[in-house]
């Protein structure tokens, strides 16, 4: 039977698949729309397995906060190209993943992928992901998620660079007003910009400090001038350098990026806001995700990629 342009258009709108793929599906199923959708799903799942060898290092971080502000989630979903990361279908899918993660009881990403997909419980999250790979046309990966709950305060969220970075901040406080919320947002922006590894120096292990001291001592011993200095001077140098490093990697010790004097720490900024609002405020922790962080991107020759797609 003849396949009409209207049928192709309808199937394309239903599935988001390519025009030629839709035409092939309709031809193979003799114009049966439901069977054509299944045909594309099956074809898509097979294609998804093929695409899985390609590196998904771009993508999007999405945050979601409950209405009462007590609970929040951040997810990272990767794609192969920045172009797809800006695609509306991809962004909507990431929002759906965030909604799923908000309500999950999964302890890790593997358990999350194995649970039923809330929008279609006949599929698992992993199977729904494979279907999206077929529709969008690139390898994708739900890389990670994190939930933060704070009953005695609220959780602030912030996304930066169009979702390249997603941040959650756990704020314990007995006062929740606009000023305190603005403070939390400013702290989240600080985290996005300066990438702290810890909330405070109390979280840094003694093993980490000792390891850093050993490295610094080795550096000094390998320096002809510094190695000749008295032991007490060397000890003071190491202590000073450790202190400087902790100031860089611990959020509350960092210099607040908006400090008018260029010296005020994040801790002092939080203290000032607490005092001004008659509040007790503690920044208990944070989560910072950056898309593709730690993923090695695969570089391919563009001409070779085009030739590959053209079948040459």
Model-flagged regions — what are they?
Residues 2-312:
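N-terminal assembly/interaction segments in proteins that build large macromolecular machines
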